[in-house]
Amino acid sequence: MKEKKRKLLQINITANWGSHGKIAESIGKIVQQNGWESYIAYGRWMNPSQSELYRIGSDWDERIHGLGSRLLDNHGLMSKKATQRLIEYMTHVQPDVIHLHNIHGYYLNYPMLFKYLEQAAIPTVWTLHDCWAFTGHCAHYMYIHCEKWKTHCEKCPNLQTYPKSWFKDRSYQNFEDKQKAFLSVKNLTLVPVSNWLEQQVKQSFLRHVNTLTIHNGIDTSLFCPASHLSAIRQKYNIPDTNEVILGVASNWYHKGLTDFVQLRNLLNNNYSIVLVGLSTRELKSLPQGIIGIPRTQNVAELVSLYSTALVYVNPTWEDNYPTTNLEAIACGTPVITYDTGGSPEAVDNHTGFVVPQGNIEQVATLIQQIQHSGKDTFSAACRARAEKLFRKEDCFSEYYKLYEKLISR
């Protein structure tokens, strides 16, 4: 008799789109290689996938949910029909493991989902890509140094950040609702993506839930030192004699754009600052001496930029475990990062430097130090670290090991 295949069902805001969607896609491929079936349920935005895809809700439902969230601060409490249909789909699939990623984003009703998870008693893994799971409102609180989430959220000072609320502050009740829902599932394992985030979880109402940190990985066969770099300099009019200081973000909010403007004033014109991922408004506001590039899906161009750079600078004010650090190091480029969240965890003494938040003068000094030493003194160590620690095949295989462990209990 043919053995029944194991089934993994993942839930995320996107499918094979953006960093978290691609993580879910990579995990799906790994379980398929081990004989499993893979399903991904998503809210919006997708690329073709090797997994079976299921769209949760619709564009219209998402807009209504988004409006309700802005008016009533009830993010995650709408989309009831969409969530009921998702539950029916999950009941049809009968997965052996359910893996949650970002369940926020105006597409899902989390009390309904967790009621189902509680009743179904299916082993559930939840990768925490941010802090939304244990706050009464926000996904990030580092920038304003808020610690209300450690005791009980109320009178939220962060209402104007995602998921933005224009009028109402429901943070006290949201905190209560999340606590009730998320602590109801006994067969739940939390997976923070950085040691820093694990320590935050341990100080929250989720402190007693099983937790295992698994760092994100990247495709080190794609992100590797590139050659023939003159073309990228020509494309963006970077002088051959200039050293390139690179910054990359998909969204520059709280990622240090103003810090780069300050850095430009501290460095002479022998350095070219290149920033990737800027919006149209940000591109228009750039001062002279900074080269701005819109968000790109062109990985080959990104690899060329990483490889061209003398150093990758990440003056982020809010982050958990930025993938861009890994990508730069894999391309043989040292990293200078602020001591923010889990960002320093990608770097060691041979591959970069960690600087206190806001100390842009020290960043400038370290750039000059790296130039004096020569990038070559870092490149081999960078590549070796990437091959040892950042390979996505190794990182995401840890999830498969976790699934097998949970099923065998």
Question: How should these model regions be labeled?
Answer:
Residues 334-337:
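Short hydrophobic beta-strand element within catalytic cores of glycosyltransferases
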Residues 284, 339-354:
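Short acidic/histidine- and often glycine-rich active-site loop of Leloir-type glycosyltransferases
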Residues 317:
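Aromatic "clamp/platform" in nucleotide-sugar-dependent glycosyltransferases that forms part
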Residues 376-389, 395-401:
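A short, well-ordered alpha-helix in the C-terminal region of glycosyltransferases
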Residues 280-303:
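Nucleotide-activated donor-binding/catalytic signature segment of Leloir-type glycosyltransferases, i.e.
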Residues 304-309:
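Short alpha-helical donor nucleotide-sugar binding micro-motif in glycosyltransferases
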Residues 349, 353-360, 369-374:
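Conserved acidic donor-binding segment of nucleotide-sugar-dependent glycosyltransferases
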Residues 191, 239-255, 261-264:
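Conserved donor-binding/catalytic core segment of Leloir-type glycosyltransferases
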